[in-house]
Regions:
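Glycine-rich phosphate-binding loops at beta-strand->alpha-helix junctions
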Residues: 107, 299-307
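Glycine-rich phosphate-binding loop plus the immediately following alpha-helix
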Residues: 20-27, 36-53, 128, 134-162, ...
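Conserved nucleotide-sugar donor-interacting segment of glycosyltransferase catalytic cores
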Residues: 115, 121-135
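Short beta-strand-loop/turn "lid" adjacent to the catalytic site in phosphate-handling enzymes
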Residues: 61-122
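Short glycine-aspartate micro-motif
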Residues: 8-12, 97-101, 172-177
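Conserved non-catalytic scaffold segment of RNase H-like nuclease domains
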Residues: 34-75
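A contiguous, well-structured pocket-lining segment that forms one wall/lid of small-molecule binding clefts
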Residues: 219-301
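N-terminal beta1-alpha1 ligand-phosphate binding loop
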Residues: 8-24
Length: 307
């Protein structure tokens, strides 16, 4: 990408599978960035549950073929849903939009076998909205010997320059991105080569285990403001066992929510389970921060953001 400023819509649906985040920005992809619009569009209850059910069915590569009919059906629905979002935004900004970044909905991710599957038909979306669509981000990263995740560090690299200038925060600058999976980025300096200037990795679960526990044990979808976790008590024995069983030994592989589950909290009350799972999640994020700052040669300020 040259130094030209592009106006783009980016659409992302994370592992919570509850809806689509849409952002309209203007950027050259290097050091200039302006936010124009951020919106959230929630999936209806039926689509949300069907997505969760489908993801639970897909346990291996063979299942992608086994459930191909259901995958194709929901993929079309997902694509049309994204198209409606773009058309709504385009009513205000149509003549300014250069391209669309379309992530889709991940239902299976296994970088070890070089497989990742996102629901979303980029070609159909382009036909629906009559605009250029960039898609298959994770597949292309894996084809080029990447892990397919995390992808946000490229954006963190750009934003770090803005933060450095506006807020006078010195490099290196860290980002803790807590989505379904948590990932940590460290941007080393302002003008480094992007391939050498970023240290980034998945650190463990973000909201995925907490959300799973809430969905299984209540009619809620998530722990709003952490109120449920605040009302319970940590079961230290179970927490220690979970840490021993799940602690990340290496940060060179991307993670999927299927790398973790809430089975270790079975038998606990709803509140105590939520509290213990939340502390387990926080512990792994803290260990990731410790690893990110392993040389301890410079103080790093970390910005916490949600996925």
């Amino acid at each position: 990408m040259n130094n030209k400023l592009y106006t783009a819509i980016g659409l992302m649906s994370g592992t919570s599978m509850d809806g689509v985040d849409a952002s309209l920005i203007r950027s050259n992809g290097i050091d200039k960035f302006t936010k124009i619009l951020n919106e959230y569009h929630e999936y209806d209850t039926s689509l949300h549950q069907r997505l969760i059910d489908l993801r639970n069915f897909i346990l291996n590569f063979e299942d992608l073929e086994k459930y191909s009919s259901k995958i194709n059906e929901i993929e079309r629905e997902i694509t049309i849903f994204h198209g409606k979002i773009i058309n709504q935004i385009s009513l205000k900004y149509d003549d300014k939009i250069d391209l669309i970044g379309f992530h889709g909905q991940t239902i299976y991710h296994n970088p070890g076998k070089k497989i990742t599957k996102q629901l979303g038909d980029g070609k159909l979306l382009s036909q629906l909205i009559k605009k250029k669509v960039i898609f298959d981000f994770r597949q292309e990263d894996i084809k080029n010997n990447g892990q397919g995740a995390p992808l946000t560090p490229i954006f963190h690299n750009l934003v770090s320059k803005y933060i450095n200038k506006k807020n006078q925060i010195l490099f290196p600058i860290g980002f803790i991105n807590i989505g379904g999976i948590s990932n940590i980025t460290k941007v080393l300096e302002a003008n480094g080569n992007i391939e050498e200037n970023i240290e980034a990795f998945d650190s463990g679960p973000g909201n995925c285990l907490i959300d799973e526990w809430i969905r299984i044990n209540s009619k809620k979808k998530f722990d709003n403001y952490g109120q449920i976790a605040q009302s319970g008590k940590i079961d230290q024995l179970i927490l220690n066992q979970a840490i021993d069983n799940f602690e990340i030994q290496s940060y060179d592989k991307s993670l999927d929510i299927k790398n973790f589950d809430t089975s270790f909290a079975r038998g606990l009350s709803f509140e105590d389970g939520c509290t213990t799972i939340t502390n387990f999640t926080a512990y792994l994020i803290a260990k990731g921060i410790e690893y990110s700052n392993k040389d301890k040669s410079k103080n790093i300020k970390y910005l916490i953001c949600g996925g």
